[in-house]
Every structure is written in C-alpha cells, then in structure tokens.
C-alpha cells in the first residue's frame, strides 16, 4: 500500500489539491475532500490564501523595485557552441562534459553558450562554476534517458576516498575553472565529505539551463538504511531552468542551496529555480535545501528499496525572512512498495530557517 501523509507543519495544501492512495480510480477523476483550514498536521489553504502562492511570487526579487524573473521556454540554437560525444564523431568538440564546460567558462563570455550532449553514458562528476555568462546543457537524444550522467558518491565517504573517486586523472586541477569547487570540498577537515560535496552534477552558474538529460547518483541500494546523503543534482545559482530531466538517487536527490563560491550557506540570498516536465526519484529528503523552487508537471517517485523507514519528498530549509520556498503545481506523487511516504518535513537547520512547501492544482 502506498500512503502519503504530512509531517510537522512543513507543508500546506492549496484548495482543490487531490492526493490518493490505494485507489484504482485515476487521480484526476477523484474529487477533493480537502477544505481549509485543514488540521494542524495537514494545513489547507483557502482559495484566497492560495492566490498568493503562484510562480510570479516565488520568482520575485529580494532587491526592492526589481522586476520578478519571468522565465520563458528553453530555446536551442541550430548550431551549439560545443558538442560532447564519442571521439571521431563528426561535429564533436569534446569527449567529456566537464571538458566542454571548462572550455565554455574559459571564454568568459557574457552571452549564453550551448553545450549539446550526444546520447551515451557519461560517468563522472560535472562541476559548473560561476561565470559572467550562462550555460545551457542539453541532450540530443529523443528522450531524457538517452543521455545519462552518473557516479556513485556517498556523503559519508572520507575526503580521501571522495578525492580519489571524483578526480581521476586530474580532471580538476589548479588553473581550471572548476578547481575552486573541488578544492573547497577536498579541503574539508571532517570525518566525511557531507551532503554539500556529494553531488554528481553541481552548478553555481546563474541562468543555468538543463534539458533532456538524466542525472543519477548511482550509490542507490549499495549502502545501508542509515544516513547516506547522495545528491544527484545540486544547484546554487539564480534563475535556473530544468526541463525534461530525470533526477535519480536516494537521499537528498535534488539539493538547492544558496551557497557562494566559498561553499557556505548564506542568509541574504534567494536563488530561484523552475523545474518543468521532469521526474525526481529518491527516499529520504529527496528534494531539499534553500531557495525558491517551482515544480510544474513533474513526477515525484518515492522508492523504499534501500530503507523501510519513512520517506520524505520535500525537506525545505526556507530562510525565515522569505515567504516562498517550494511550490509544486500540476504534479504527481507516487510511491513504490509498502510503507509510509511523507510529503514533507521542515529542514530547519538553524534559527534562520523555516521550511515552507505548497502543493496545489
């Protein structure tokens, strides 16, 4: 049986939302029995309250008198700036994604640059640094699964093991654009690398666009049911767009932070992200972190093959001085196997955070 419930006061349901479990009737054909104000464990927004929780408000700027971000659909050029694929293939400029990213960042261009990725499996991390211009990475296959970026990284691994795993052959070296990101993590003095350095794809690029890709932390069920952060995608930049992307993992699958180049969380910055037409899979705190994130027409899938403990879809750490955290619209929530899948819990790591999620429509 697949059961969804709400943990703590982390999540509010907007008027008219439908959640189902153990039913053969299609979800869109079941009338909602949710009415405001709901209960202390399942707060429900009234129609008037729900009017405030729309994408335009999530994409507003923290800077006074600045217009909100109004993202438009991702458009692709007839000819990309860089092409990643097998050596010797006509048009290919690089055989690894990281090499193409490094080449793009090295140009120090203020315009958007496009990296096309041919179908195939690309093992290894991809670090996308902060830069004057924005990058678009997109798969050229028919489906998102045709381009797979993956590696197994456990946040509980030692710094030494992590260094050996993510930097074979000196992929990250002094003088290369992403060196500062690698160096911030390899310089950690703790017993383990931690969630902040466990990502397969990590971006600090403002305006980053990802489309038609699969990003997976391959750690999967190779570890026990304990604490094993294993981020597939981490984004720190503002105005990030993710469309038709599969984000796969277990714990902390998709991690949104507001960290600066020193890899430290900030209390005065709110990155904005739009996720559309995508698929996210995991178990514990599968979507977590700071920032304003709008999910539209996205599928969330909870899996319990690694742990039978309660799973959580959302774990926001919204800054307490900001009204908007995560918003899911026109989206679907499913779970595999038996057990309880919580829609969310607040990841209030300190006095500056008060997690907020709204699921509606």
Where do the model's predicted regions map?
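Sequence-level preference for short, compositionally simple segments enriched
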Residues: 30-361
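Bacterial signal peptide processing site
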Residues: 23-25
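C-terminal motif of bacterial Sec signal peptides marking the signal peptidase cleavage site
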Residues: 18-21
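Bacterial N-terminal signal peptides that target proteins for export
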Residues: 2-10
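Intrinsically disordered, low-complexity serine/proline/glycine/threonine-rich regulatory regions
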Residues: 12-14
């Amino acid at each position: 049986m697949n059961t969804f419930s709400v943990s703590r006061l982390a999540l509010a349901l907007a008027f008219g939302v439908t959640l189902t479990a153990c039913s053969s009737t299609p979800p869109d054909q079941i009338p909602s029995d949710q009415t405001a104000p709901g209960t202390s464990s399942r707060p429900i927004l009234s129609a008037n309250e729900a009017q405030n929780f729309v994408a335009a408000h999530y994409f507003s700027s923290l800077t006074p008198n600045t217009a909100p971000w109004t993202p438009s659909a991702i458009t692709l050029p007839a000819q990309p700036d860089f092409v990643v694929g097998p050596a010797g293939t006509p048009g290919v400029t690089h055989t690894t994604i990281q090499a193409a990213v490094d080449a793009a960042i090295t140009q120090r261009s203020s315009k958007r640059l496009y990296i096309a990725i041919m179908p195939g499996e690309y093992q290894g991390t991809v670090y996308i640094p902060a830069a004057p211009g924005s990058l678009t990475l997109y798969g050229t296959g028919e489906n998102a699964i045709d381009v797979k970026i993956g590696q197994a990284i456990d946040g509980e691994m030692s710094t030494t093991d992590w260094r050996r795993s993510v930097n074979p052959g000196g992929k990250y070296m002094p003088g290369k654009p992403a060196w500062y990101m690698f160096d911030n993590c390899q310089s950690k003095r703790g017993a383990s690398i931690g969630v902040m350095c466990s990502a397969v794809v990590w971006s600090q690029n403002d305006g980053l666009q990802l489309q038609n890709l699969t990003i997976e932390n391959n750690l999967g069920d190779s570890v026990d049911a304990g604490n094993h952060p294993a981020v597939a995608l981490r984004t720190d930049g503002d105005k990030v767009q993710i469309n038709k992307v599969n984000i796969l993992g277990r714990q902390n699958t998709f991690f949104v932070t507001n960290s600066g180049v020193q890899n430290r969380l900030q209390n005065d910055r709110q990155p904005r992200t739009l996720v559309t037409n995508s698929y996210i899979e995991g178990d514990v705190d599968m979507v977590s972190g700071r920032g304003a994130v709008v999910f539209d027409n996205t599928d969330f899938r909870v899996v319990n093959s690694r742990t039978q403990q309660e799973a959580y879809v959302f774990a926001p750490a919204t800054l307490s001085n900001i009204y908007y955290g995560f918003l899911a619209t026109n989206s679907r929530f499913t779970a595999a196997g038996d057990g309880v899948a919580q829609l969310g819990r607040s990841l209030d790591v300190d006095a500056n955070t008060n997690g907020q999620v709204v699921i509606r429509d």
